Swiss-Prot record:
It comes from Emericella nidulans (strain FGSC A4 / ATCC 38163 / CBS 112.46 / NRRL 194 / M139). Its main location: cytoplasm. This is COP9 signalosome complex subunit 5. GO terms for biological process: cleistothecium development; hyphal growth; protein deneddylation; protein neddylation; proteolysis; regulation of cell cycle. GO terms for molecular function: deNEDDylase activity; metal ion binding; metalloendopeptidase activity; metallopeptidase activity.
Length: 335
């Protein structure tokens, strides 16, 4: 049980802060007031550079995203801001209507959000809403056109961050697939070099157009995770409840539908690139470089699928070597 918990923490680089510095969880009114008055993010589109998320808040978001299955879910994050940094201390779900491509926040969700935050303040928790999160089941962490519009609207009222979690890739890879983003002002155009620096990620063919159309409207923030002394106790209690499922489940079976979709998507991308090569024979120059880039992306997608499948097979093999025949051995020894 402890090994599984430690493995999860190491995989996601969760660091333990000094117990004497647990004051990071306390709302710093002076810093918040100073930043709210000066509003440095209005002068620098890249002012916020990182997001620090508590381990418990991350678990809440991942479990919520996983519970939605193939449907998108949505929630709110609480915390505060520091210079250049968002600190997320907690998260809660929102009662929203979700589909396989979007989430729609209705009046009921807005009323629930106001009521929840008011109850927190009455209980002495002064953290503000610093961002929203939602899931992208199976198609990566990025902002769609609707997400960009939602984030633009939220940023008008103050500092806000958008977090995206892919529950399917999280289960398949064994590491939380998460991204944090902020949108640029309408009158700002990022340099071309900055757009090219973005790390390549696998996007399904049916989402590629939406991904490419809005990729220049936002930028990503570095995400780091932390836990306090109290978080350690809470995580232990959570693991007492879920460690059996961790050992008994196999990512190959849990995400078999996702794996099938990924291989189908890869075959479609391969056929598309092959048709492009056949219709435009290589003649040297820039077109050849474009084809090479397309082939390289297909190869990367295939390598990622293979690595996740191999990891699942290795996990199943380790469990079989550890637990297969234990009951039989005990019976023989008792006789």
């Amino acid at each position: 049980m402890q090994a599984a918990q430690l493995s999860w923490e190491l995989e996601n680089a969760v660091t333990l802060i000094d117990p004497q510095r647990d004051s990071l969880y306390r709302y710093d009114e002076e810093t918040h007031k100073y930043l709210s008055d000066t509003r440095p993010w209005t002068k620098d589109p890249h002012y916020f550079k990182s997001v620090r998320i508590s381990a418990v808040a991350l678990l809440k978001m991942v479990m919520h995203a996983r519970s939605g299955g193939s449907l998108e879910v949505m929630g709110l994050m609480q915390g505060y801001i520091l210079p250049n940094t968002f600190v997320v201390t907690d998260a809660f779900r929102l009662p929203v209507e979700g589909t396989e491509t979007r989430v729609n926040a209705q009046d009921e969700a807005n009323e629930y959000m106001v009521s929840y935050l008011q109850s927190c303040r009455e209980a002495g928790r002064m953290e503000n809403a610093v961002g929203w999160y939602h899931s992208h089941p199976g198609y990566g962490c990025w902002l769609s056109g609707i997400d960009v519009s939602t984030q633009d609207m939220q940023q008008m009222s103050g500092p806000f961050v958008a977090v995206v979690i892919d529950p399917e890739r999280t289960i398949s890879a064994g590491k939380v697939d998460i991204g944090a983003f902020r949108t640029f002002p309408k009158d700002y155009t990022p340099p071309k070099e900055e757009q090219e620096e973005d790390e390549y990620q696998t996007v399904p063919l049916n989402k590629a157009e939406d991904f490419g159309a809005h990729a220049s409207h936002y930028y990503s923030l570095e995400v780091s995770l932390f836990k306090s002394a109290l978080d350690t106790e809470i995580l232990s209690l959570l693991w007492n409840k879920y460690w059996v499922a961790t050992l008994s489940q196999s990512p190959l079976f849990t995400t078999r539908d996702y794996g099938s979709k990924q291989m189908l998507d890869l075959s479609q991308k391969t056929r598309r690139v092959a048709r492009g090569i056949e219709s435009n024979p290589p003649r040297g120059g820039a077109p050849t470089q474009v084809r090479d880039q397309q082939l390289e992306r297909v190869v990367k997608d295939g390598q990622r699928i293979v690595s996740e499948e191999v990891k699942g097979l290795l996990a199943a093999e380790v469990k079989m070597q550890l637990f297969q025949g234990i009951g039989g051995k005990q019976t023989v020894e008792s006789t």
